[in-house]
A protein has these predicted regions:
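Flexible loop/turn segments at secondary-structure boundaries
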Residues: 140, 221, 269-272, 282-284, ...
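Conserved NTP phosphate-binding and transfer environment spanning the P-loop NTPase/kinase superfamily
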Residues: 2-65, 340-634
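N-terminal pre-Walker A segment at the start of P-loop NTPase domains
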Residues: 221-254
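Glycine-rich phosphate-binding P-loop
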Residues: 256-286
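Short acidic, glycine/serine/threonine-rich loops at helix termini
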Residues: 143-148, 275-276, 321-325, 344, ...
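Conserved, well-ordered active-site substructure
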Residues: 260-262, 325-339, 521-532
Length: 634
């Protein structure tokens, strides 16, 4: 018999038996929210409360996970454990027996997941209240809708509120008849303490006609954010398409030339920055580079910058229904709200547009890892500390797309796909892989290779990385941490995508350092301005020369923006006096050896034959021309 406190809307849903049992046969009060205001009140534990501790009983003791503070401009979620403030790249485990290259629950923990799955359901049934959040993964306005649901214990309502800000949600009164979720996220924070040694663990269970995600921690990154990404990747793997890990921006110059750039790469690779306005000094100049040894500064005078029309921040849906006859890749956004990292905003005036949007929003926002005084304004440059004097490197705000200026709500045809990598300082005394110039032009075969290897790069702020600054791979597509299946399947999908969009071109952009020069993201912004001023004109072979390291493709012979030539050493790192050929070649070998090691895993019978030829070319130290010849487009 169904219990009391069950809203009628649950009877309209077609739910899996286990979820139906939780909702209809437990004593928990079931809440299907109607408004954002209701979700915020739930997160605060009451309409008039200004603070709310998120606590659970674990083995007879109260364990506090974090605190929610109500400010004038939104709510601030702060977790007590610094390890819960950013994503652990090893959080995903697979519970099912479908093909996967990810660690399974049995492999990692030595136990089957099914008993823990049943314990999770029993624990959820024992809660005083459960918040059920129906939502669509995909893009509602474009008609790409995959029904999903989250089931969240009442005292973790901050998670439900944040998820609704990231993915959108279907109000209780708008849930359609026969709503049948293709994926369900179950949230049970106590299990990280009772079963998983306090670690971030998200278990994925792919069933015949749906996917279950068990989030055993409250940090949004691996579940409410990337968990939904994994849902789209799993569906795309079955249907033959990809959701790309990319920001996208339409750039319109003062001369009304247009260019649409999609920027891919590992976390910290410059995706959010690609949609940001260029940062200027007080006198209006752009600080492009600072010599890390001498302190000498290089400025660029850019009189009028382009107008930016953001399309995507992190997840670009390349669904088959969007593609057209342009021979360019066509994408739309897969997110309702953007999970913006603001660690670079450390004082007032750093990024006025974002600061204004956060300090005076049109509706309350959700912040993470920020200092918060109840009833005051949360200031996005005031980050909490992981330890005394050590600011948290991952302060975040969830910014609904509708609150962004100049947002593009439809599709975008991609002129240029860029790929970002964080690079370290590189000198004769300390040779490293910071040998990439301000931008490189990649033939499509090399563009595919970079997406297979996806180096995570130097000083990544977004994730927990115990390995320091050793080079690591984010994995195929740079979205591999969120995928559940086989790497080779994603590699084949990416190659198919490149071959089917021959009019989209490819570049490589480093950030942080170019040789001895500290650049941050300035090189990315200046490259964007330069390419947009070209109006999408293709590079001719005579304007390019082979990079000294062949996997870096081509370098432009010269770059001039608004009449100012760019220092040639920022284009060809080996000619920097502090670097030279010898240090460059040491860095090139480090980079090439890393690529060769990472590419071995793709050499399987399932790999597309052309893909095998491209990988063989890397293994055999092919020339740039040989890479071009494999897919002869530029």
């Amino acid at each position: 018999m169904a219990k009391k406190n069950k809203p009628d809307v649950v009877n309209k849903m077609v739910l899996p038996q286990c979820l139906n049992d939780i909702i209809k046969n437990s004593d928990a009060k079931i809440i299907v929210p109607e408004t954002k205001e209701e979700l915020i009140d739930l997160a605060m534990g009451g309409k008039d409360k200004l603070t709310n501790d998120v606590s659970f009983e674990v083995n007879g003791k109260e364990v506090k996970e974090g605190t929610v503070v109500k400010c004038k401009n939104g709510i601030v979620i702060n977790f007590d454990d610094p390890a819960m403030r950013r994503r652990d790249p090893n959080s995903m485990v697979i519970a099912d027996d479908l093909p996967t290259d990810k660690p399974t629950h049995m492999e990692r923990f030595g136990t089957p997941f099914e008993p823990i799955r049943n314990e999770t359901f029993d624990w959820l049934k024992s809660q005083e209240s459960l918040i059920v959040v129906p939502f669509y993964a995909g893009n509602v306005s474009m008609g790409i809708t995959y029904p999903c649901m989250a089931v969240v214990p009442g005292n973790s309502a901050c998670f439900a509120t944040a998820l609704a800000e990231l993915q959108g949600f279907i109000p209780c009164s708008k849930v359609p008849n026969y709503f049948k979720p293709k994926a369900v996220i179950y949230v049970a924070p106590t299990f990280r303490h009772t079963h998983y040694d306090g670690k971030q663990i998200v278990v994925h269970n792919r069933l015949y006609d749906m996917q279950e995600i068990f989030s055993y921690n409250l940090y949004l990154g691996p579940s409410a954010k990337k968990g939904v990404y994994s849902i789209l990747l799993h569906i795309g793997e079955q249907e033959g398409w990809v959701t790309l890990h990319a920001s996208t921006v339409k750039v319109v110059t003062p001369y009304e030339l247009e260019l649409t750039i999609m920027h891919e790469g590992a976390s910290g690779g410059g995706k959010s920055e690609m949609t940001e306005p260029i940062h200027r000094e007080d006198d209006g100049k752009v600080l492009l580079a600072t010599n890390s040894i001498t302190g000498e500064e290089t400025y660029v005078g850019i009189s009028d910058t382009a107008t930016l029309y953001p399309v995507t921040d992190d997840m670009a849906l390349a669904h088959p229904s969007l593609q057209n006859n342009s021979k360019k890749l066509v994408v739309c956004d897969a997110e309702y709200g953007w999970f913006l990292r603001v660690n670079h905003i450390d004082q007032y005036g750093t990024e006025p547009e974002t600061e204004k949007a956060c300090c005076h929003p049109k509706e309350p926002l959700v912040f993470l890892n920020m200092n918060a005084v109840p009833g005051s304004t949360c200031l996005i440059w005031d980050h909490i500390e992981d330890a005394p004097g050590v600011p948290c490197p991952n302060p975040r705000v969830i910014m609904p797309r509708k609150l962004k200026n100049n947002i593009v709500n439809g599709t975008a045809e991609i002129d240029v796909r860029s790929f970002g990598i964080r690079t370290p300082p590189t000198t004769k005394e300390h040779p490293d892989y910071g040998i990439i110039g301000m931008f490189h032009v990649l033939p499509p075969a090399l563009a595919w290779i970079w997406r297979l290897v996806a180096p995570r790069g130097f000083a990544n702020p977004s994730i927990i990385d115990a390995g320091g600054n050793q080079m690591k791979s984010e994995g195929v597509g740079s979205y591999w941490p969120f995928a559940t299946g086989k790497k080779v399947d994603q590699a084949n999908l990416l190659l198919k995508q490149i071959l089917s969009t021959p009019s989209t071109r490819y570049i490589l952009i480093p950030n942080q350092y170019i040789g001895v020069y500290k650049v941050g993201f300035a090189g990315e912004w200046v490259t964007r301005e330069y390419l947009s001023r070209r109006g999408g004109a293709k590079f001719k072979q005579e304007q390019l020369e082979d990079a000294r390291c062949s996997i870096l493709g081509y370098v432009p012979k010269s770059v001039k923006i608004d009449g100012t030539p760019i220092n040639p050493g920022l284009l060809k790192v080996n000619i920097q006096g502090r670097v030279g050929n010898e240090a460059y070649d040491i860095g090139a070998k480090k980079l090439t050896d890393f690529f060769k090691e990472q590419l071995k895993q793709f050499d399987t019978p399932e790999l597309d034959p052309l893909g095998k030829k491209i990988i063989d070319a890397v293994m055999n130290d092919a020339s740039v021309q040989e890479f071009y010849d494999l897919i002869p487009k530029l």
